[in-house]
Amino acid sequence: MKKGMKKLATTLLAALLMITQLPAVESKAATSIGMSGKAHVQSYGDTNGRIIYENGIETLVLGTRGQAKRVESITVNLKNNTGYTGTIQYRVHRQTYGWTDWTTSGQPAGTTGQGKRLEAMQIRLTGELANHYDVRYRVHIQTYGDNQGWVYNGALAGTTGEAKRLEEVKIQIVPK
């Protein structure tokens, strides 16, 4: 019996040593992508975004809730360490002025110092990143709250032509 146990222990030890010598496999996991950002908010000026975890998913939150303050501009910074090409782009619909052109990670979209509310937005991923991840986002709209729910990959969040301010924006990037 002792001889059998010794042989089993030797075999297990040899297997363990072989496994530890295998080359590491690079993983392109969801943890290799993240965001930060800021919003220009009525009365508060530039405010840093905050990261929360909603249902276990990293979520960038911009703006305020329950304070009746308009978001006037946003800036989203993408941290892409996936090895895939691509970035995040967004555009916003502004009071009086309408839609901006698509803006790339790290660039502001909207206005500051003009007292103009954001009313709607669209967000999308580009390049290989868009083939492997979805961007989903939800806005808190004056009077309507969160009733629109989550929208994905360039869909419109918010309203146009209704004079309703965006108060809060939540953004997630999730694997497909």
Region annotations inferred by a language model:
Residues 1-12:
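Bacterial N-terminal signal peptides that target proteins for export
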Residues 29-176:
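Lectin-type carbohydrate-recognition ectodomains
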Residues 10, 19-33:
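Sec-dependent signal peptide cleavage junction
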